[in-house]
């Protein structure tokens, strides 16, 4: 008797799709998943949320970010259901009150992750089930410039070692624990440093979005060799914004040009000196910064965390999302 497996031609074996923990979706397939979810933003609101150099319009919001807000709304509801199941199990032994649903948004410098985070904040806050949505960037947990200089880390700014990772993890852990009020330092891109004496206060949001380069980094082992809890261990969902390095470099340089003509003109700007040299000289600096710092960080630290995300959003050369990969449950 011929076995069912041996009777299949070898070519048929080769044609089987490779097993993957992700469900890959085209832009059209993803867009169809929004169903009848209404778009709560208008063109003016989208323009205000758009980052410098980022190309985004109502069609992009409708096709990509509206379905994502619907998915996240379902995840929040499912998490509430799990909490109810746990409370049923615990009975009189104790019960859990609701704690914030935490979303991580990761990706390279200039890839558009800040715009993604702001759009998610705006869209998710329009759902009646979770109107209080807070957004925190990891910039506030960069070490102050004086400390970076003392440690010889100014050329490594943005690398994992340039952050107070323990304080960042503790901040999110406190929010996840349900503390009434948690504070974070404030970072200024104008002065390129932590703002002395300023704090951002987060008060029991329904959803917390944490955006930054290294939010998906695994925890470093302690001096005793024990594995620690990492920031991403507190995430209920995570998004990685992906693109080819050569496209990100082009976006980075375009953004630098626009900043040189706008924000860098401010007398208080840390980068004002690049408005006082020729454009070619300024762009040479930007290219060097990209190739020796930002690209190195992307390839060594940021991109390797892509596989830890629940959703990978892949952009094409025009900043438009082309494909998405959603982790299977």
Curated annotation (Swiss-Prot):
One Pfam annotation reads PRK
Claim: Transferase is one of the keywords in the record: yes
Which reaction equation describes what this protein catalyses? Answer: (R)-pantothenate + ATP = (R)-4'-phosphopantothenate + ADP + H(+)
Entry annotated with the keyword ATP-binding: yes
Q: Which GO terms describe its biological process?
A: coenzyme A biosynthetic process
The EC number(s) attached to this protein equal 2.7.1.33
Major place of localization?
Answer: cytoplasm
Q: What class of enzyme is it?
A: transferase
- Pathway(s) per entry: Cofactor biosynthesis; coenzyme A biosynthesis; CoA from (R)-pantothenate: step 1/5
Q: One GO MF term, please?
A: ATP binding
Which superkingdom heads the taxonomic lineage of this protein's source?
A: Bacteria
Which HAMAP family did the record assign?
Pantothen_kinase_1
This protein is called: Pantothenate kinase
Q: Source species, please?
A: Streptomyces avermitilis (strain ATCC 31267 / DSM 46492 / JCM 5070 / NBRC 14893 / NCIMB 12804 / NRRL 8165 / MA-4680)
């Amino acid at each position: 008797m011929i076995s069912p497996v041996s009777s299949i031609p070898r070519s048929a074996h080769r044609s089987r799709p490779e097993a993957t923990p992700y469900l890959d979706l085209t832009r059209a397939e993803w867009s169809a998943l929004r169903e009848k979810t209404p778009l709560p933003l208008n063109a003016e609101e989208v323009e205000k949320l758009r980052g410098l150099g980022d190309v985004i319009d109502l069609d992009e919001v409708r096709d990509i970010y509206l379905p994502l807000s619907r998915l996240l709304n379902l995840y929040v509801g499912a998490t509430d259901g799990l909490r109810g199941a746990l409370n049923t199990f615990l009975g009189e032994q104790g019960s859990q009150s609701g704690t914030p649903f935490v979303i991580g948004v990761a990706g390279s410098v200039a890839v558009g992750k800040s715009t993604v985070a702001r759009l998610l904040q705006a869209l998710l806050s329009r759902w009646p089930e979770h109107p209080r949505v807070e957004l925190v960037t990891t910039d506030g947990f960069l070490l102050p410039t004086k400390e970076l200089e003392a440690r010889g880390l100014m050329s490594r700014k943005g690398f994992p070692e340039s952050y107070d990772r323990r304080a960042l993890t503790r901040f999110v852990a406190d929010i996840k624990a349900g503390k009434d009020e948690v504070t974070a330092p404030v970072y200024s891109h104008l002065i390129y440093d932590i703002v002395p004496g300023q704090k951002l206060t987060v008060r029991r949001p329904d959803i917390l979005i944490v955006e930054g380069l290294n939010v998906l980094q695994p925890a470093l082992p302690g001096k005793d060799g024990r594995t620690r809890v990492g920031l991403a261990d507190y995430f209920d969902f995570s998004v990685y914004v992906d693109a080819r390095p050569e496209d990100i470099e082009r976006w980075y340089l375009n953004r630098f040009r626009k900043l040189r003509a706008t924000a860098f003109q401010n007398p208080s700007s840390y980068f004002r000196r690049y408005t006082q040299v020729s454009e070619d000289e300024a762009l040479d600096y930007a290219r060097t910064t990209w190739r020796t710092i930002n690209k190195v960080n992307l390839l060594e630290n940021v991109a390797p965390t892509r596989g830890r995300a629940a959703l990978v959003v892949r952009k094409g050369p025009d900043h438009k999302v082309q494909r998405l990969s959603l982790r299977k449950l």
